[in-house]
Amino acid sequence: MDFVAGAIGGVCGVAVGYPLDTVKVKIQTEAKYTSIWHCVRDTYRQERLWGFYRGLSLPVCTVSLVSSVSFGTYHHCLAHICRFRYGSTDVKPTKADITLSGCASGLVRVFLTSPTEVAKVRLQTQAQSQTQQRRPSASWTSVAPALCPAPTACLEPRPKYSGPLHCLVTVAREEGLRGLYKGSSALLLREGHSFATYFLSYAVLSEWLTPAGQSQPDVLGVLVAGGCAGVLAWAVATPMDVIKSRLQADGQGQQRYRGLLHCVVTSVREEGPRVLFKGLALNCCRAFPVNMVVFVAYEAVLRLTQGLLT
């Protein structure tokens, strides 16, 4: 049931957090945005409400599978570790056991999420690249009337990607399989230690928030533990998340980065060390409500099925 509960929790979470995820990606990949509000205002002015939901269909279709694998892998890995170390799955796992299982859960996710992350980032940043292409130079404007009676129509390029599936097919055709796994090195580093932090912090906070005489926290305890676990996980994940987003968005036009280290060095040299924490506040603001919903849905499904089976 961990797989089913994880799937339901993941879908609920993505429904809550996707608009803020779009803003986060734009802030991380476009240097022109000076603040969260600047990005929100600019996105709404150019694309209206739909601009915050670009590329949503693919995450909604795949997040149930990914979340299911994450929670299922964590649970089964933890059970195998306890059985191997202590001879029984009923023994309370140590923090090291939880950390290792969480890390394994994060690493497994990468093989499923990398292609969808590439498509999501390309679609989320596509509108900005189109806007830059439409912006004419002074010299072009001076001759435009003679060449084209309707400059606006001539300057409106069609989007390169018409949707998530078209984006995946286009990337695979133009860049090969490596294109679908672009940024996966940064994604591995992000997911490994962030999911170790995620599950460890949730387990510790749940234990602290469990009322005396009970074996598990109430709904309020789950809300607080889940939200805080999400915030802590994104706090450690943000530097690699910035690099991941830049590497994955780099497939559009001339490529700037040769790899993970080159991206880190170039980004820090051009924008300073603070660039690695671009979107941190937004990540944390998004993580709290999203992971509150994820863990409440996850725990609700588990407790419901346990009640029906007993």
Swiss-Prot record:
Name of the molecule in the record: Solute carrier family 25 member 47
Keywords: Membrane, Mitochondrion, Mitochondrion inner membrane, Mitochondrion outer membrane, Repeat, Transmembrane, Transmembrane helix, Transport
Pfam families documented for this protein: Mito_carr
Lineage of origin: Eukaryota, Metazoa, Chordata, Craniata, Vertebrata
Similarity comment: family membership: Belongs to the mitochondrial carrier (TC 2.A.29) family.
Single GO molecular function: NAD transmembrane transporter activity
InterPro entries hit by this protein: Mit_carrier (IPR002067), Mitochondrial_Carrier (IPR050567), Mitochondrial_sb/sol_carrier (IPR018108), Mt_carrier_dom_sf (IPR023395)
Gene name as annotated: Slc25a47
Membrane topology: Multi-pass membrane protein
Signal peptide: none
